Amino acid sequence: GAQVGARDKKVVLIVGDGGFQMTLEEIMMIRQYNLPVKIVIINNSFLGMVRQWQELFKDRRYSFVDLECNPDFVKIGDAYGIKSERLKTKADLENKLKDLILSDEGVILDCIVEKEENVFPMIPAGKTVSQMIGKKGVLEND
């Protein structure tokens, strides 16, 4: 929808592999309407946000977050006729980002990251934006 509403803008979706699976049927629209949407999948084979919460607040007692049987996102993109590629290193990503942004077509980049890579900053339950957890994994203003 963002690309349809802003045809003259570059639209980039940054999404985890779990989140992408919840909405991947939307890529049909990219192909059907030839939309130049760029999709960058952060693929750690986990429901990343939930896993991170379970790591930080539940002593790594992981429950129902492992996505070991992820589909092949590159093959899914290819099946829809969308240019798709898997990246496994930071250098690959840095090299491809420029090509991605300059492309006039829809693109899917499946970026493989460490399984337990965390995303910061984050706001813990019951805290405010001013009490977010920063880069070092500690409360900023507690």
Regions found by a protein language model. Name each.
Residues A2-D142:
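Thiamine diphosphate
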